[in-house]
Each structure stands twice: as structure tokens, then as C-alpha cells.
């Protein structure tokens, strides 16, 4: 049976089955790491809600999630967020308009998720949506609910807590400051 990360990526020598990370190769001395993968997720306020996508790919196909995905080599988290938002929804935003909302390690610590807050859009200004390889539909949520990933659910809840636990003016100020910083 194949075990992922069971051999040195430099010389191919097998690691001990219970060897801790990072792993030092006994044959060549190379040090191997298994680091979390970086992910960029976009919080796009639309009117009084937040944009979500219904996933058309695994994991969690058919479930609602915030738009986002893996950060490619050579991309900033803002560039990745803008790219993923466009790929999944057809919506264009400028990477420099994204502001950090929160950073969270996903359960199991296999991914490190950067949640970026985009500038608010009006629903009539959104481009027409067509289902694609990654997204079945887009939906604007106006209250917290369970999403495909626990980090998305927690972040959605936090977004609405900031929005609803303050006066409308305070919430606008808090969220606008997050976008303008």
C-alpha cells in the first residue's frame, strides 16, 4: 500500500514509518517538510449580505462556501483571492482592494486560510452568472448558516456578528475600516 510522504523527495530513500516532521533523510541528509497549503477566500458584501457559491467540485460538492482556493506560487493572497472570485463567479475585483479580515488554520492544520474582505457591491451591479466547472450557483446570504467548511462557517458568523452587534453606522465603519486599511 502506498503511503504519501514515505520517502525522501530528494533521493528516494524510505523514511521510518513513525519519523516526526520535518524529516531528516538518513541517506542524503536532506530535510523534508510537509507544510500547510495557503488558501485565499473572499468575503464579498453584496447589499446587506455576503456572497457564497454552491460548489461544483469536491470536496463538499453541492454545498455552499465562500469563494476562494489555493494560492499559486508567485501570487499574493490578494491576487489569488481576486483570481478565484473571478474563476468561480465571473466577478472582477482589484487585488489591492482586498483587506485582511482574518487568518485561520483549518482543522487538521493542512491549510492556512486568509480571509479577505472586498468592497461592497450592489446586486444589480453583479455580472450575469453562468454555472461553470467550479460553481453551480451564487447566493447572497443575509444571516449566518452552516457552510461547506468549518472555517467558512466561523468567518461568516464573525462577519455577521460584527455587522449586527453594532449600530448600522458602527458596523459600516468597522467593515469599511477593514476594507480601507
For every predicted segment, state its role.
Residues 71-158:
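Unchanged
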Residues 26, 54, 142:
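Residue-level detector of conserved, well-ordered beta-strand and adjacent loop positions
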Residues 34, 60, 107-109:
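Short glycine/serine/proline-enriched coil/turn segments at secondary-structure junctions
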Residues 45-87:
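Conserved Nudix-box catalytic region and its N-terminal flanking loop in Nudix hydrolases
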Residues 41-43, 51-53, 114-117:
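Short, hydrophobic/aromatic-rich beta-strand segments within well-structured domains
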Residues 38-40, 60-62, 94-97, 112:
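A generic structural signal for short beta-strands and their flanking turns/coil linkers
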Residues 158-181:
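Charged phosphate-binding loop/patch that engages nucleotide di/tri-phosphates or the phosphate backbone
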Residues 1-41:
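Acidic, metal-coordinating catalytic segment for phosphate/diphosphate chemistry
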Amino acid at each position: 500500500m502506498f503511503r504519501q510522504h514515505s520517502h525522501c523527495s530528494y533521493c528516494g530513500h524510505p523514511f521510518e514509518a513513525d519519523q516526526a516532521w520535518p524529516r531528516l533523510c538518513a541517506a542524503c541528509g536532506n530535510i523534508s517538510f510537509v507544510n500547510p497549503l495557503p488558501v485565499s477566500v473572499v468575503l464579498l458584501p453584496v447589499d446587506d449580505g455576503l456572497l457564497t457559491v454552491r460548489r461544483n467540485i469536491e470536496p463538499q460538492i453541492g454545498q455552499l462556501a465562500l469563494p476562494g482556493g489555493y494560492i499559486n506560487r508567485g501570487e499574493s493572497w490578494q491576487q489569488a483571492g481576486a483570481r478565484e472570485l473571478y474563476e468561480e463567479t465571473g466577478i472582477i475585483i482589484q487585488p489591492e482592494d482586498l483587506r485582511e479580515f482574518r487568518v485561520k488554520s483549518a482543522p487538521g492544520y493542512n491549510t492556512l486560510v486568509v480571509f479577505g474582505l472586498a468592497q461592497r457591491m450592489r446586486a444589480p451591479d453583479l455580472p450575469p452568472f453562468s454555472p461553470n466547472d467550479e460553481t453551480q450557483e451564487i447566493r447572497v446570504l443575509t444571516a449566518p448558516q452552516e457552510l461547506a467548511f468549518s472555517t467558512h462557517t466561523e468567518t461568516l458568523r464573525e462577519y455577521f456578528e460584527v455587522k449586527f452587534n453594532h449600530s448600522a453606522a458602527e458596523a459600516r465603519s468597522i467593515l469599511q475600516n477593514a476594507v480601507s486599511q
